[in-house]
Amino acid sequence: MVMTKKDTNISTQQPLWLQGYIDSPEKQNQLYKKTLKILIFSQIFGGAGLGAGITVGALLAQDMIGSENVAGIPTALFTFGSAVAALLIGASSQRFGRRAGLAGGFLIGGLGAIGVIIAALINSVALLFVSLLIYGAGMASNLQVRYAGTDLANEKQRATAASMALVSTTLGAVVGPNLVNTMGEFADSIGVPNLAGPFIMSGAAFIIAGIILLIFLRPDPLFVSTAIANAEKKDDKVQIGGSLKNPAIDKKGIMVGAVIMILAQLIMTAIMTMTPVHMGHHGHGLSEVGLVIGLHIAAMYLPSPLTGLLVDKFGRTTMAIASGATLLAAGLVAAIAPADSLSLLILALVLLGVGWNFGLLTGTALIIDSTHPSLRAKTQGTFDVLLALSGAAGGALSGMVVAHSSYTILSISGAVLSLLLIPVVIWYFRRIQEKA
């Protein structure tokens, strides 16, 4: 049954089917588990769409234009597209539910991938750039799915729920790039340019992910969680002047959660972006570069279930500090690693991935803790815009830093920046303890 806009209005009288969830913790738990399964299933396809397209975007643009100067444009375009889409998905999810917002993002991203294929067929650079921008919507949905898993989770389950969506993305993200050659051969066989082949997979994967959410994500977890929160009037009144019309939010908590995620994203993207270049300049082959980046990506996502458990068990403060300390270690190891030491570069990039994972899940949990369900999706979308832009800034600035100094200076800068996390987090949680 689809919830209408009327159903989402704050009211003391709820539809009977929705009242059943409000009155029954058992039904809430069943819906929570069902929602997680659907999100995990959709993310496997979403990850495949994400990984396959990113792998060859730069190569396709370079091939069509005939210049290496444009190799960075595709990344910038779909990163900017994902930032804009994150805002729109957050706003539409708040108004129409997670199902509409997330499914819409995946479906639009799939259309973007189809546009890339058409652009390659007719050799239209303008259409290629517009399509890559639209393709970013799939990336935005891919990242915002982690929030949907937390809508019905209690405070001790939120980081764990978010982590399940992240780790399921890994399955598709690993499979996608490994099918690049296969999809290229398939594209050749049907008369499509070889480098556009992976976008056939991306388009299909994003569209399948969207259809899964559109059909199966019912009832909408955000609508149900909002109704449950609105029914708990006594709890709302206890929170810092909260009311049903103006539900309480912890603005400082939101900002600290955002700072944790944004700094982790900025540091990770900056060092990750320049590591392949640094390795290439010192004689490492493509296979070695692929090994380092592959292990780094695995470290970004595979620890998610364990990280989620740690965040829920030991708290946001502990894991935020752990994120800062791990990113600090990553920057220092990268800075002191001899250029010909593959093992130390692997260690640095694995630490970088783990530190990012700690920061993303801790920041996500903190933002969820600090917002009322009736405002949550819009707030999450807003901060995912900043997350995407910080990644783009990290990638752009890293090249400038290395061009004017060195990879060592870049790594040390990342290490120093990571130290900012620790005092910010300690200040915030001391404030919480004083109020308690």
From Swiss-Prot:
Keyword Ribonucleoprotein: no
A Pfam family the protein falls into: MFS_1
GO function term, MF aspect, one: transmembrane transporter activity
Transmembrane intervals: 38-58, 70-90, 102-122, 125-145, 160-180, 197-217, 254-274, 291-311, 319-339, 342-362, 383-403, 409-429
Keywords carried by this UniProt record: Cell membrane, Membrane, Transmembrane, Transmembrane helix, Transport
Main localization of the protein described in the UniProt heading: membrane
Membrane topology: Multi-pass membrane protein
Record localization: Cell membrane
Superkingdom in the source lineage: Bacteria
Any one annotated GO CC term: plasma membrane
Family (UniProt): Belongs to the major facilitator superfamily.
Protein name: Uncharacterized MFS-type transporter YddS
Provenance organism: Bacillus subtilis (strain 168)
Phylogenetic placement of the source organism: Bacteria, Bacillati, Bacillota, Bacilli, Bacillales
